[in-house]
């Protein structure tokens, strides 16, 4: 895992602003957003459950996978061109992650 992925995930989970190269964490009133090349790939809502939602925004790249894998509770791997999220086939569309 690249250092930028680790650093951005740490800031994302702690709701702290971050910007380096192509990766940014934006903290809003109700949600913290992780962006990669301007695409919003993860959301952490400021609700009681601290809901975490992710998407690959249609970009099945190693960089997208690396940024998402750095987030606690997210494990993405690829087999025969199919992405698997926490052990289940995943189409990359927005999904809530259960803790």
What feature does the model see in each segment?
Residues 1-99:
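Terminal leader/tail segments of proteins
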């Amino acid at each position: 895992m690249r250092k930028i992925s680790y650093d951005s995930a740490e800031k994302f989970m702690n709701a702290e602003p971050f910007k380096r190269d192509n990766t940014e964490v934006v903290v809003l009133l109700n949600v913290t957003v992780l962006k990669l090349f301007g695409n919003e790939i993860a959301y952490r809502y400021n609700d009681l459950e601290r809901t975490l939602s992710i998407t690959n925004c249609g970009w099945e790249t190693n960089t997208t996978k690396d940024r998402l894998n750095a987030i606690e509770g997210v494990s993405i791997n690829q087999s025969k061109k199919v992405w698997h999220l926490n052990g289940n086939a995943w189409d990359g569309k927005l999904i809530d992650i259960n803790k």
